[in-house]
């Protein structure tokens, strides 16, 4: 991971749009998405459960044709939880992979960001409500202090994102 957050933002701004047909690569059994980690002031991470799913994941989703990963990340956060992110406050954490939660036998490949909410947005975090296809919101400790914290979490969260956030200071 680069030490200068500004470089991460610039890299995300200039990333190439994701090809129209590349969200699901059936030949390689890969689902390409963008995921966004959002931590509150207590360090808890927002996870979401989509309708029809029993597991929790980061806000995010599949790209629309021509979108860059950063554009996808911002759009999905706005659609799913009603928070309008400032793209300059998105920090690219990397391209992370794990077993897909909802697509058996597939790997999810996620351009992963952490969003640093503004002071005003930190106040909004306590009153967020599920929107669009989201059925439930859950705040969890990325240190995964108990088995019940991790039981319903996506492998991408437990194997990649939470360990990364647990050793990363709050933005």
Label each residue range with its predicted role.
Residues 84-95:
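A short coil-to-beta-strand element that immediately follows conserved catalytic motifs
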Residues 31, 58, 91, 107-110, ...:
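Short connector loops at helix/strand junctions that flank enzyme active sites
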Residues 12-45, 62, 113:
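Conserved N-terminal beta-strand and adjoining loop/helix that marks the start
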Residues 40-80, 84:
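Conserved Nudix-box catalytic region and its N-terminal flanking loop in Nudix hydrolases
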Residues 39-44, 53-54, 64, 98-99, ...:
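Short, charged/polar surface micro-motifs in flexible loops or helix N-caps
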Residues 96-127, 138-143, 161-169:
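Active-site-adjacent beta-strand/loop module that shapes the phosphate/pyrophosphate-binding cleft
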């Amino acid at each position: 991971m680069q030490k200068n957050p500004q470089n991460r933002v610039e890299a995300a701004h200039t990333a190439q749009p994701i090809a129209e047909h590349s969200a699901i690569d059936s030949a390689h059994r890969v689902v390409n998405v963008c995921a966004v980690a959002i931590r509150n002031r207590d360090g808890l991470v927002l996870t979401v459960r989509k309708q029809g799913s029993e597991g929790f994941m980061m806000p995010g989703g599949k790209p629309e044709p021509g979108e860059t990963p950063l554009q996808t990340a911002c759009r999905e956060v706005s659609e799913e939880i009603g928070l309008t992110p400032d793209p300059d406050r998105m920090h690219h954490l990397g391209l992370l992979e794990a077993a897909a939660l909802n697509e058996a036998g597939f790997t999810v490949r996620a351009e992963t960001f952490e969003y640093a909410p503004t002071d005003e947005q930190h106040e909004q975090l306590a009153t967020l409500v599920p929107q669009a296809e989201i059925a439930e919101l859950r705040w969890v400790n990325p240190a995964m202090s108990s088995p019940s914290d991790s039981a319903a979490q996506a492998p991408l969260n437990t194997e990649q994102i939470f360990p990364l956030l647990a050793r990363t200071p709050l933005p």
